[in-house]
């Protein structure tokens, strides 16, 4: 029979990647794809590049009681309401791709996002970066944000080993326009992004991107870590993400030592690789890989970490399927082998 899987928010950029991946997954028997904006339209009509049959359903048309697994790709706030209904409806596993369950402290969530619709579920959520925090043992996965995925993979081995020696962390991140979502806006219009690069998430003279507390909280689970300065930039490309992370610390390790830490921590995982060559976005676009590297500027006394991911795959849909695989006891790369 195979798994009965539902996708809520299946017409956004992340949602359609989920459709593409799960339609070809060997353990998925049936797929219900919900979209309020496109209910009744054929999936291939909305996204001709996706060779998947069937129509988008209105969320109310999905038989929740029949689902084994549900993926929720709504925005924050709306997502939590859907997750609550799915868990109450008996769905075996829910993978939420919004920010609603990434921050375990409701006070921190409300500072950055507003009132939380389902705070009683925060304690049930497992932060789904398996290479760092392992696989889920429960029913709810909080899929990480794209920027935190790259940042935490790069920083986790350093924080584990250097802890209180780290004095400051500055993350300079660049992402393709798909990271801003499918809904058009003046900021993501072709004329606005073409032949330009612009920082965002800076408000009132202060960097205030919502991924900042997510990165800080997860690093502090691993060891002593300072506040993080995080500034993302929009690139005039469709997909992909590159981060250059500057770490100030007391005694700096060598670049080869850091690469050794990466290989030690991630050697048993399929989708994280460390190389001496600095990563390019083109190295990881359209894959579920994260590529890491390191360098040391001894003249300035700084450690430089580099991380590249595809924001729609390892930064979202690919990681979500990886989390499903691990939670259900399948190999982590099942259905993702072509994305290694």
UniProtKB/Swiss-Prot annotation:
Its EC number is 1.2.1.38. It holds the Pfam family Semialdhyde_dh. Pathway: Amino-acid biosynthesis; L-arginine biosynthesis; N(2)-acetyl-L-ornithine from L-glutamate: step 3/4. It is an enzyme of class 1 (oxidoreductase). The active site is at residue 146. Keywords: Amino-acid biosynthesis, Arginine biosynthesis, Cytoplasm, NADP, Oxidoreductase. It catalyses: N-acetyl-L-glutamate 5-semialdehyde + phosphate + NADP(+) = N-acetyl-L-glutamyl 5-phosphate + NADPH + H(+). Its main location: cytoplasm. InterPro entries: AGPR_AS (IPR023013), AGPR_type-1 (IPR000706), NAD(P)-bd_dom_sf (IPR036291), NAGSA_dehydrogenase (IPR050085), Semialdehyde_DH_NAD-bd (IPR000534). Catalyzes the NADPH-dependent reduction of N-acetyl-5-glutamyl phosphate to yield N-acetyl-L-glutamate 5-semialdehyde. Belongs to the NAGSA dehydrogenase family. Type 1 subfamily. HAMAP family: ArgC_type1 (MF_00150). This is N-acetyl-gamma-glutamyl-phosphate reductase. The gene is argC.
